[in-house]
Curated annotation (Swiss-Prot):
Cross-linked residues, Glycyl cysteine thioester (Cys-Gly) (interchain with G-Cter in ubiquitin): 4
Gene Ontology terms describing biological process: protein transport
Protein name in the entry: Peroxisomal protein PEX21
Modification after translation, per record: Monoubiquitinated at Cys-4; acts as a signal for PEX21 extraction and is required for proper export from peroxisomes and recycling.
Matching Gene3D superfamilies: 6.10.280.230
Gene: PEX21
Region (Disordered): 23-52
Subcellular location: Cytoplasm, Cytosol; Peroxisome
Subunit note: Interacts with PEX7.
């Protein structure tokens, strides 16, 4: 046995004696001064357990876990205290709305939330809204609807006016320039036009319509009466017909015929006139009955009748 290691008798004596330097397995240590209660076996065991724990690796790992658990428990308590403090805080924002405005807005949200439920139950929802705000809303909406309706009506009128102008332009007859009418016709051409008007009016009567209605002669007389066709004037006289607008020749050139005096039958001359002159239509009817235009072209027939 070495000198550094104490015997069992020495350890027992050390427990009962006063303060003295003891020798242990690890090394010497100073015992605290005091009575028997302070140097009891329990305190020595705790001291030795602490020394062993400091030298044991596994005990060193368990101690931080115990400390962490204690810290977490203390942290939960602190967090609960922080939540209670935060919820009890009252922040005074200088830019916040007034309490009166917030109450009014809360009432507005309640009314808006009640509207869909009222429609589902079959109500219009007007009972949930006060009378004055609804009247003000109607007064504000009515002028807007009136202005919008007036604008739509004005746009519709402008559109219809443009469409009517286009239709009138398509349906209107082409305008004949004034330079192509009477001022370009001389005395003979104007007389020929007036005679053609009388002939066309006479042959358009129901009594002659079946006979001359579909003839080319009637078409020519109509064109002459409207001024679309007139006599062609040359150095040798009037030798044909042409279009007034373009100068194109109409029909074939007619041959000059000798003037013939048509003898009116005595029976026709002896008809009673009742003191009045016979109308031009009656005279033309008698003339057409006596003039033979068979085998003649439309131009020749016109010249034969008008000569």
């Amino acid at each position: 046995m070495s000198l550094c290691q104490g015997s069992a008798m020495q350890k027992l004596i050390a427990k009962t004696e006063g303060p003295m330097a003891g020798v242990g397995r690890v090394g010497g240590f100073n015992r605290p001064s005091g009575g028997l209660g302070q140097s009891s076996a329990e305190q020595q065991l705790q001291a030795r357990a602490g020394e062993r724990a400091s030298q044991n690796r596994f005990m060193a790992v368990l101690e931080p876990q115990r400390e962490l658990g204690g810290r977490m428990a203390r942290g939960d308590g602190l967090q609960a205290d922080w939540v209670r403090q935060f919820s009890s805080m009252q922040v005074e924002d200088p830019l916040a709305f007034s309490a009166e405005y917030q109450r009014a807005y809360a009432g507005y949200e309640q009314r808006q939330a009640a509207r869909p439920a009222a429609r589902v139950l079959g109500y219009g929802g007007s009972m949930f809204m006060p009378t004055m705000p609804q009247q003000q809303l109607q007064q504000q909406v009515a002028p807007q609807q009136t202005a919008q309706a007036a604008l739509q009506e004005a746009e519709l009128e402008r559109y219809l006016e443009r469409e009517f102008d286009v239709l009138e332009g398509e349906l209107a007859p082409p305008e004949v320039p004034e330079a192509l009418s009477a001022p370009l016709l001389d005395h003979e051409q104007l007389g020929f036009q007036e005679s053609a008007k009388a002939i066309y009016a006479t042959l358009s009567a129901p009594i002659h319509k079946d006979k001359f209605g579909a003839s080319k002669f009637m078409g020519l007389m109509r064109q002459v009466s409207t001024g679309d066709v007139t006599l062609s004037k040359s150095e040798s006289g009037y030798t044909g017909l042409h279009m007034t607008a373009g100068g194109e020749a109409v029909g074939a050139e007619y041959r000059a015929v000798t003037d013939e005096v048509v003898q009116v039958p005595e029976v026709a001359a002896a008809l009673p006139l009742a003191g009045e002159e016979r109308s031009l239509a009656s005279q033309m009817e008698d003339l057409l009955n006596k003039v033979d235009i068979a085998g003649l072209s439309s131009n020749e027939a016109a010249m034969r009748i008008l000569s």
